[in-house]
Amino acid sequence: LPELQQEYSQGSGGTFDPSSPFAWGPKISELANDPTYGGNTDNSYTSQYGKQSGKYYVPQLAAAGMNPWATPQAYNNMKDFFETGVSWSNNVNVAQRFDKGNYSFSLGNTTSNGIVPSTGMDRYNVKMSAEAQLHPNWTTGFNGNFVTSKISKQSTANTSVVATIYNAPVSYNMAGIPSHIEGDPYTQNTYRDSWIDDAYWAVDNNQFSERSQRFFGNAFVKYTTKFGTDNHKLDIKYQIGDDAYTTNYSEIYGYGSTWAPTGEDSE
């Protein structure tokens, strides 16, 4: 993960702004002395709650129904959000050979959990093949593969779920502040006013999936004849094959998404 500065807080021009996407505010160590939000100063919040030594007022905590006073510190929002990706596979294979033929059957599964919460992949594959000698001159066989997979993912590009993670000011605790206001899961509660969904809210409410099914394989018949010796022979082979697949895409934006405020379901 990239290294971020750990000194300056949310805001711009040296002024703290709890709804700013920038990190050009005052030093984090000075937030308790902020004239508007600082717990050490006289302002509307300390008039209501009393002085809060060494702390500052966070409107998003108040909106979530939590204690609105926080101790200034730098957070690693990227490390808190991303998970360790894990992938594992299981395979079973059965094969046997006879005097005049052979067969093989295999079954496999691959499961992956992505680094973004709620993302991953499940894939199953089946393979069958067989070959038989029908006559000293005639051989036939086939092989077929069937693969089915489901991929759970999140939005990308202009609506990327990680946009609010990478750009989050280090003074804002994304993991510790609920992503929606108290009692209303459809109203987002985040550090910026934007058309990009909060990453934690998106993981809980938006769903993007891709389901695919694919079959590919071939069958053949082969005629072999010799001209007196093993080094002089003729093979004639006829083979047909197929490769077909379908993919269904689903995009669901939850009610309250900044991209689709009333929700959206498309396939």
Predicted regions and their residues:
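Residues embedded in well-ordered regular secondary structure
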Residues: 1-117, 155-157, 204-205, 220-223, ...
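Flexible loop and strand-edge segments within Gram-negative outer membrane beta-barrel domains
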Residues: 67-108, 112-119, 125-196, 204-214, ...
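Membrane-embedded beta-strand positions of outer-membrane beta-barrel proteins
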Residues: 105, 142, 219, 236-240
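Transmembrane beta-barrel domains of bacterial outer-membrane proteins
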Residues: 126-128, 233-241
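Short, well-ordered amphipathic alpha-helices
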Residues: 128, 217-224
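Short, solvent-exposed loop/turn and secondary-structure capping segments
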Residues: 153-155, 248-252
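Structured, charged N-terminal subsegments at the starts of enzyme catalytic cores
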Residues: 221, 246-249
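Solvent-exposed loop segments that connect transmembrane elements
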Residues: 254-266
